[in-house]
Amino acid sequence: IVVTGTNGKTTSCRILEEGLKKAGKSYFINKSGANLITGVTASFIMNSTITGKCKKDYAIIECDENAFKEVSRYIHCDVILVTNVFRDQLDRYGEVTHTLNAIKESVKNLPNAIVCLDADCSLTYSMSKEIPNKIITFGVNVPFDKNAKAPEISDAKYCIFCKHEYDYTYHTYGHLGGFGCPNCGYKRPQPDFAVESVEEMKNDHSVVVANLNGDRNIIRVNIGGAYNIYNAIGCAAALTAFGIDEKTVIDAIEHFNGAFGRMEHFKAGDNTVNLILVKNPAGFSQTMNFLKNI
């Protein structure tokens, strides 16, 4: 399983790891977050015999969006989870279309993989029109904040196909939400795996009602933050595509442990410290929204 995209890779890998562990699978993961070609290669070496035979049956690989082009040439992949595409690391990637094209070209090297795409991201979902792979979609059917207005800054304000401005029925965060182009008709699909309502959002968890490919479930996401609801539903899609049963999928989401710096909480004297890693404008904005509600 390969996880790529701008935000959510490391946390998603933690959920996937919990799912494979609970399912009794033999696997390894590049847990240190070394997600360039050198780090991915080192992970395979560390989990292989001296003659090059892998000691495990499966791998969960976090992969940098740009490095995926090279990595995809050397691996067999069952499932690819693309979390989202946002403006990020402009010194490396330039505009968001560069990141999108890098992922798209990488996926084309793995035509037999099932690809899980964020239906709420107009950039990410656009790949479904240009790749031969089987597609599974995930998303959030409702806004996290019913009073939320359109974001002042959007990484995808205009249709990727015809350049007309999108209309939105609702926003979740950034450019994610119920997008639709009134000119060419490109729009958000109804996701295969969808959060239908958000019942509770706390500092350390969220409770959602989710439709997992037709089955409605109440799920407690074992980490706070709106964007981690996306990570959870994306992993539900990826684990199901991998063949993990629904009960184990839900169990993984409800009991996984977060990664270093990802909504990490610890005590400093009598105070609780929240350690939250941010790397780009979209992530920073969501972190500010989270902190103002604590």
PLM segments and residue spans:
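Gly/charged, well-structured mid-domain segments that form the phosphate/adenylate-handling core
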Residues: 186, 201-203, 238-278
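Active-site beta-alpha connecting loops in nucleotide-dependent enzymes
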Residues: 259, 277-294
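A short glycine/serine-rich beta->alpha loop
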Residues: 26-31, 218-226, 272-274
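A conserved, hydrophobic alpha-helical segment in the catalytic core
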Residues: 74-84, 176-190, 220-254
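Cys/His-rich short segments
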Residues: 140-204, 222
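Acidic-glycine-rich active-site phosphate/pyrophosphate-binding loop
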Residues: 10-19, 199-215
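Phosphate-binding loop of NTP-binding sites
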Residues: 1-139, 147-150, 154-158
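Buried hydrophobic packing segments
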Residues: 16, 20, 40-44, 232-242, ...
